[in-house]
Design a protein with these regions (language model features):
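Compositionally biased intrinsically disordered regions enriched in Thr/Gly
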Residues: 20-256
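C-terminal motif of bacterial Sec signal peptides marking the signal peptidase cleavage site
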Residues: 16-18
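Bacterial N-terminal signal peptides that target proteins for export
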Residues: 1-7
Length: 256
């Protein structure tokens, strides 16, 4: 049975403690998809100790060179934005008191013969009250040799997003009434954060089975999208039978 999961953000001075290790996600698991980084983290220290940048990247096959190029461009953008923030008035003075930090763990979360899914789990601390979470994903179509977004999987992307929204809302609204750990949110925030057509389902991973097929999708919502910052990012599993009819013909064989 596919159930809702909560991804816990554990913030330390350096930023977000990322999820590491484990195996590819399989259908019916009880924890979020573990990201697998196969290389040591590269750490760069800034001039005068103003900042630290920590980065880990996945090992990818040569057939996934377009995915590697996409990830490299993404990392460059994140680094530029982080460094640009040091040019703001008073930024360097604040960084001397408490050094800033960019932390990016980028790793393969799941793969099949058709797809390689990569997750980004990171944070940027730039002097605010707490680090800003960085939550992203990339899905590579091995046959088409290109990175695809969620809407590119579907002949009727709006219909698919309506199905995602219905299941996400059902699970998240149920979590509001959890007796042990109620979700720190409300129905208005959940509805707004899962509205179709607003790029709300951009970050996702694949629920894969032993048959090398995709059995469902896990949508990951960053802090503030459907719940409070303290609640951390939220993850909702949507089984494939909720959206199979909306898939493009060329992708139906990759799902079950």
């Amino acid at each position: 049975m596919l159930v809702r999961h909560i991804l816990s953000l554990v913030f330390v001075t350096a930023g977000l403690a990322a999820c590491r290790g484990g195996t590819d996600r399989t259908n019916g698991g009880d924890s979020p998809p573990p990201a697998r980084a196969s290389v040591d983290k590269d750490t760069e220290f800034g001039h005068e100790g103003l900042y630290t940048m920590e980065l880990s990247l996945p090992d990818l096959p040569s057939k996934a060179d377009p995915l590697r190029a996409t990830i490299d461009r993404y990392v460059d953008r994140q680094k530029r934005a982080f460094m640009d923030s040091l040019d703001a008035p008073g930024a360097r003075e604040r960084a001397r008191e408490l050094p800033w930090d960019l932390n990016l763990d980028i790793a393969v979360a799941s793969r099949t013969d058709r797809f390689i899914n990569v997750q980004v789990d990171g944070s940027a601390f730039t002097g605010a009250a707490h680090p800003a979470a960085i939550v992203d994903s990339f899905t590579y179509d091995v046959q088409a040799h290109r990175v695809i977004g969620i809407r590119e999987l579907f002949a009727d992307p709006h219909g698919a997003e309506k199905a995602f929204a219905a299941e996400a809302r059902r699970q998240l609204l149920t979590a509001l009434d959890d007796q042990d750990e109620p979700l720190a949110s409300d129905s208005e925030q959940i509805d707004a954060g899962t509205e179709p057509g607003k790029d709300h389902f951009r970050v996702f991973s694949l629920l894969t089975g032993p048959d090398n097929k995709v059995h469902g999708l896990t949508f990951i919502f960053p802090p503030y999208q459907v719940a409070s910052y303290a609640a951390g990012p939220q993850a909702v599993d949507v089984p494939s039978d909720a959206f199979l009819t909306y898939l493009k013909p060329e992708y139906r064989g990759a799902f079950r």
